[in-house]
């Protein structure tokens, strides 16, 4: 949502090329980080190479989705309305067609690309149907771009989030079943029988509505800092929980023997710890980066002085 909003805004500000470049670089970076987190370094050092590091997780899906959004926007950039409608229709179409690729095995496609389309080889997420959520997010971004300055926009959007979200959660399944009977389309029956995508979208919209409604109370410095460090938090949590590189993480150490109280208490402690680590690591990295840049500038100035 935020990425697409800034992308559309960049056209108005005359910085579209820079924003596109940043988006593509960001997308490729997320894909790269996703693969790196799966590399079993110690196993590789013993000469035991496998293909598990090529499985797809959420970062690769987000990265590829950013690249796809940039490409679609380039095709429809002359009219924001066209881009908005395309993203809404694309998200809906992907969700409706989910039963068609739910069991797709991609047998004739090279493993590297097949993992983006099927979970058969161990992928946690696949680009379909999860790109659908990115498409809906891009559509919502166009609403912010077009109507943010309008009177009562916030009230209207919050109401829309709640109403649409609750309809999707409680009403989408019966609607799909009735439509399937009416037009005799078995695909809608399959969607209704495993309607996790539209229900989850409804939950997301309700949560959006809550966060947007309490926006003024959430603009605390700590909350804003944590919000800016989501990638670092994800990477650190992944390393600690799943044992990236070493293969030994908390899930292997603790297993599934914790009581409900231990799970809740442990989850809170884990979230706080990961957030603090992320904040202080970023601060340390900032100081190191500044120190290196200062030294490089000093060496550059010294070189110029000696040459003169």
Range-by-range predicted roles:
Residues 1-308:
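Alpha-helical transmembrane segments and their immediate juxtamembrane cytosolic regions
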């Amino acid at each position: 949502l935020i990425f697409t909003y800034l992308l559309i805004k960049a056209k108005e500000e005359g910085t579209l090329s820079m924003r596109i470049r940043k988006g593509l670089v960001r997308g490729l970076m997320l894909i790269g980080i996703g693969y790196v987190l799966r590399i079993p370094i110690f196993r590789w050092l013993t000469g035991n190479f496998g293909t598990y590091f090529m499985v797809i997780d959420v970062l690769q899906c987000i990265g590829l989705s950013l690249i796809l959004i940039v490409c679609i926007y380039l095709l429809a950039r002359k009219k924001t309305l066209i881009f908005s409608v395309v993203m809404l229709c694309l998200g809906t179409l992907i969700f409706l067609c989910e039963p068609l690729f739910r069991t797709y095995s991609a047998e004739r496609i090279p493993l590297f690309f097949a993992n983006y389309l099927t979970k058969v080889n161990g992928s946690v997420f696949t680009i379909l149907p999860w790109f659908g959520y990115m498409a809906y997010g891009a559509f919502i971004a166009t609403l912010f771009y077009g109507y943010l300055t309008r009177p009562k926009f916030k009230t209207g959007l919050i109401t829309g989030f709640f109403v649409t979200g609750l309809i999707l959660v409680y009403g989408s399944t019966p609607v799909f079943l009735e439509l399937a009977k009416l037009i005799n389309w078995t695909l809608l029956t399959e969607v209704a029988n495993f309607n996790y995508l539209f229900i989850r979208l409804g939950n997301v919209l309700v949560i959006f509505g809550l966060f947007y409604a309490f926006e003024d109370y959430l603009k605390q410095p700590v909350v804003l800092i944590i919000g800016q460090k989501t990638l670092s938090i994800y990477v650190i949590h992944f390393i600690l929980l799943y044992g990236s590189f070493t293969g030994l993480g908390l899930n292997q150490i603790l297993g599934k023997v914790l009581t409900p109280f231990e799970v809740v208490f442990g989850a809170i402690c884990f979230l706080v710890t990961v957030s603090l680590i992320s904040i202080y690591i970023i601060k340390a990295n900032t100081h190191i980066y500044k120190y290196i840049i200062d030294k490089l500038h000093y060496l550059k100035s010294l070189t110029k002085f000696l040459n003169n």
